[in-house]
């Protein structure tokens, strides 16, 4: 994948039939719901998904943002600074990494990119067996201590590690679960990534596994403090019953 633009596309409109999703997550930046119709247990939805890298005015604000030392974030954002049993940034090993990697850095843009680079390279092996267990509902992702020890994981473990680094430096960060679709490069599949909160901007998508900002091909369906907090009953239920691209917009996107 490239820098936020797959195949050069900065905006994609998807038409889908969905079974399980969170409406607030679905209709939040960088997505917006264009049409929504409920039929029994199936929702017919059209959304527009945009690339952050193509939003130059937003990026200008993000690049100048600094960590809020007073933590004066909106009340609904504060929970995304808290540790969880799976994403516990208070672990001494994680704190050592965060302090070495990020030090006293206050620029949010720099913190995000350093965190992305570290998370995307620290995990060395994709864990197929763990992926199967998560798909079956037998695992809710590996915790930070396990990730640091094994250096193996799925997209969820890249995301957990990145979120821990962000929260350790007072950057609110949340766990995103959704679906990726952009043929012929991407035939479709469930995926996990993260979003960082920036004062004056809101939530910004990032993909820790790819080490990049979020892509417009990543369709956000759930958000939470960690994977269990997303409230997904069955991971297979978030796979769209049908999905097609109605249109897309080309744009030159550069880091």
Task: Annotate each predicted stretch with a short phrase.
Residues 1-72, 253:
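Intrinsically disordered, low-complexity N-terminal segments that are enriched in acidic
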Residues 3, 36-38, 146, 164, ...:
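Sterically constrained small-residue positions within well-ordered secondary structures
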Residues 7-9, 40, 110, 201, ...:
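Sequence-level motif detector for i,i+2 pairs with an aromatic at +2
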Residues 10-11, 115, 194:
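Buried hydrophobic packing residues in well-ordered domains
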Residues 67-79, 215-221:
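Short, cationic low-complexity segments
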Residues 76-150, 161, 227, 236-255:
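Secondary-structure boundary elements
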Residues 153-154:
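Active-site-proximal helix/loop microenvironment
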Residues 157-237:
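Hydrophobic/aromatic-rich core segments of domains that either
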């Amino acid at each position: 994948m490239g820098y936020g633009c797959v195949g050069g596309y900065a905006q994609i409109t998807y038409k889908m039939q969905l079974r399980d999703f969170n409406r607030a997550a679905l209709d939040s930046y960088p997505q917006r719901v264009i049409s929504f119709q409920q039929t029994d247990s199936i929702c017919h939805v059209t959304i527009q998904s945009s690339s952050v890298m193509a939003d130059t005015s937003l990026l200008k604000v993000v690049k100048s943002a600094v960590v809020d030392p007073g933590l004066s974030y909106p009340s609904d954002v504060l929970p995304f600074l808290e540790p969880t049993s799976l994403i516990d940034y208070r672990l001494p090993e994680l704190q050592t990494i965060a302090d070495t990697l990020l030090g006293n850095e206050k620029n949010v843009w720099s913190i995000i990119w350093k965190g992305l680079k570290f998370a995307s390279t620290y995990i060395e092996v994709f864990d197929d067996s763990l992926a199967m267990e998560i798909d079956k509902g037998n695992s809710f992702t590996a915790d930070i201590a396990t990730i640091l020890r094994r250096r193996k994981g799925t997209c969820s473990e890249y995301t957990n590690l990145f979120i821990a680094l962000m929260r350790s430096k007072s950057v609110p960060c949340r766990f995103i679960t959704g679906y990726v679709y952009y043929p012929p490069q991407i035939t479709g599949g469930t995926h996990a990534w993260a979003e960082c909160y920036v004062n004056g901007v809101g939530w910004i998508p990032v993909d820790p596994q790819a080490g990049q900002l979020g892509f417009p091909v990543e369709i956000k369906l759930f958000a939470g403090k960690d994977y269990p907090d997303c409230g997904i009953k069955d991971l297979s239920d978030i796979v769209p019953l049908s999905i097609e691209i109605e249109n897309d917009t080309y744009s030159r996107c550069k880091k």
